[in-house]
Amino acid sequence: MAEFRSGFVCLIGRPNTGKSTLTNALVGTKVAITSMKPQTTRHTIRGIVHREGNFQIVLVDTPGLHRPRTLLGKRLNDLVRDTYTEVDLIGLCIPADEATGPGDRWIVNQIRSVAPKTILVVIVTKIDKVPKDRLSAQLVAVSDLVADSAEIVPVSAVTGEQVDVLIDVLAAALPPGPAYYSAGELTDEPEELLMAELIREAVLEGVHDELPHSLAVVIDEVSPRAGRGDLIDVHAVLYVERPSQKGIVIGKSGARLREVGIAARRQIEKLLGTNIYLDLHVNVAKNWQRNPKQLGRLGF
């Protein structure tokens, strides 16, 4: 009988390369925020892929590695680099529909510098978005980028194509080890953090590019409704940096915030398996990304 294999896998790449969507596809449920806006993942969220008697893959979903412009950006990059050295395998995500460039080379150099002994697998994402000839050209470019030093797996997290192949490749590269989590667990993140991420995802749909970096969500209180065993009250505060951003989030006569509340409530009800009442408030915390005290208060 083959030895049980287990370990930690870090999915990295430039912002918006499909890391969070891939995490959700591998796990089979939503555990990571998947907005189309760059740099939307703030916390290291672990998803767990378990095959009874065979293997367990613990996925670590990090923010996109980038050249930082704010104190928050620097802290996010530090989080990514710390993760590199603590995992068994790094999965570098490169999208099939974007040419490789200086940003990808910079990340490859960071990996080789910080974690030269960690196994590297290159995952070419979003293959459903390109024709076969363009995919072939991208695979050649990616091979040149890593100088044939890593296995390359093309996948589509949206259609599911090659996802099982990727799981097998990741599992085969892990060392023999125990199951770190029980078979029923899909993530080890607290429910309040997952709720905050789902609210952020709802806010970020269809807004201007500057807002993702300026938005933080804090769950203020979660409590059962008195006399209603089937209803939970969730109170959350959305923090932005400028009054103009507050206007974007709220919208004309509160219309935008109501849309956010409806979308987020549906996702949170799926997460909790019960009805919820979602109460949202928007506050301005001026320049919170550059203020160490504000960062600490908001969980960074």
From Swiss-Prot:
Highest taxon, organism lineage: Bacteria
Sequence positions that bind GTP: 13-20, 61-65, 125-128
Region G5, annotated ranges: 155-157
Span list, region G1: 13-20
Region described as G3: spans on this chain: 61-64
Any one of the GO CC terms: cytosol
Localization, UniProt: Cell envelope; Secreted, Cell wall
One Pfam family this sequence matches: KH_2
Domain KH type-2: 207-286
GO biological process, one term: ribosomal small subunit assembly
UniProt entry tagged with the keyword Disulfide bond: no
Residues covered by region (G2): 39-43
Family per record: Belongs to the TRAFAC class TrmE-Era-EngA-EngB-Septin-like GTPase superfamily. Era GTPase family.
Physiological role: Exhibits GTPase activity. Binds RNA but is probably not involved in ribosome assembly in mycobacteria.
Protein name as catalogued: GTPase Era
Species for this entry: Mycobacterium leprae (strain TN)
Species lineage: Bacteria, Bacillati, Actinomycetota, Actinomycetes, Mycobacteriales
